[in-house]
């Protein structure tokens, strides 16, 4: 186990992917929970309306993004392994201003529509990231590599995302009132540039570090 862990974190590309995937999960879990609250507080939707809108529009968008990410990785990475992560990196950078616009507009229907494309783009990293992780280590360490990414996503993403989003929202109430969640989401939208940067950094290391695939 110790040898596998050392091998996994001895790869700079893996470390960059680990950071990017964990931070993406942090933002995704936080936005996923509090976007529903945002539509209720800011746009006046009922719990049922907000939940249904998110489930149909953003749920389907997430599925499309996951499939599209794998397809684009296969296409762009066929001749150059560095491009396995090009689509996720570029997509997340493009998603940031679109997310901000979705949280900014006053019409909830326009907001939902604007959130669909960035949701697709932000979900596109799953397949490429896990594929790269498997190729960065020997077969004996692949299970450990995948489990470390899942561990980071759950600890940082699920464990901290919703909690910190909620704490920040509470802190902003004196300033923003019922729009406090909206302001947290404004910030979260632009923070998507961070995982985009780390996926890009990882892509620069892939050609040198990939052991297989």
Residue ranges with predicted function:
Residues 6-69, 122-130, 157-165:
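Extracytoplasmic gate region of multi-pass secondary transporters
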Residues 18, 51-52, 89, 143-148:
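Conserved glycine-rich helix-kink/hinge and helix-boundary motifs of the Major Facilitator Superfamily
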Residues 39-40, 72-73, 77, 164-174:
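Interfacial helix-cap and linker-helix signal at transmembrane-aqueous boundaries
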Residues 46, 83-86, 169-190:
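A membrane-interface helix-boundary motif in multi-pass transporters
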Residues 66, 136-174:
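A late C-terminal transmembrane helix in Major Facilitator Superfamily
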Residues 74-91:
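Cytoplasmic membrane-interface "Motif A"-like loop-to-helix N-cap segments
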Residues 96-105, 186-213:
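Multi-pass alpha-helical transporter architecture, strongest
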Residues 109-126:
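Hydrophobic core of transmembrane alpha-helices in multi-pass small-molecule transporters
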């Amino acid at each position: 186990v110790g040898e596998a862990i050392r091998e996994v974190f001895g790869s700079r590309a893996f470390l960059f992917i680990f950071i990017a995937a964990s931070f993406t999960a942090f933002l995704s879990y936080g936005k996923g929970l509090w976007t529903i609250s945002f539509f209720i507080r800011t746009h006046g939707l009922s719990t049922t309306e907000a939940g249904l809108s998110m489930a149909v529009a953003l749920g389907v968008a997430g599925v499309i993004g996951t499939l599209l990410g794998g397809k684009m990785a296969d296409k762009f990475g066929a001749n150059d392994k560095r491009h396995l992560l090009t689509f996720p990196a570029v997509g997340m950078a493009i998603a940031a201003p679109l997310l901000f616009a979705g949280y900014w507009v006053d019409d909830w229907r326009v907001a939902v529509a604007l959130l669909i494309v960035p949701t697709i783009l932000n979900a596109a990293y799953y397949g490429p990231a896990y594929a790269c992780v498997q190729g960065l280590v020997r077969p004996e360490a692949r299970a450990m590599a995948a489990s470390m990414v899942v561990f980071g996503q759950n600890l940082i993403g699920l464990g901290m995302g919703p909690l910190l989003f909620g704490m920040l929202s509470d802190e902003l109430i004196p300033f923003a009132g019922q729009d406090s969640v909206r302001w947290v989401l404004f910030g979260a939208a632009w923070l998507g540039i961070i995982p985009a940067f780390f996926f890009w950094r990882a892509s620069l290391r892939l050609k040198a570090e990939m052991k297989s695939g």
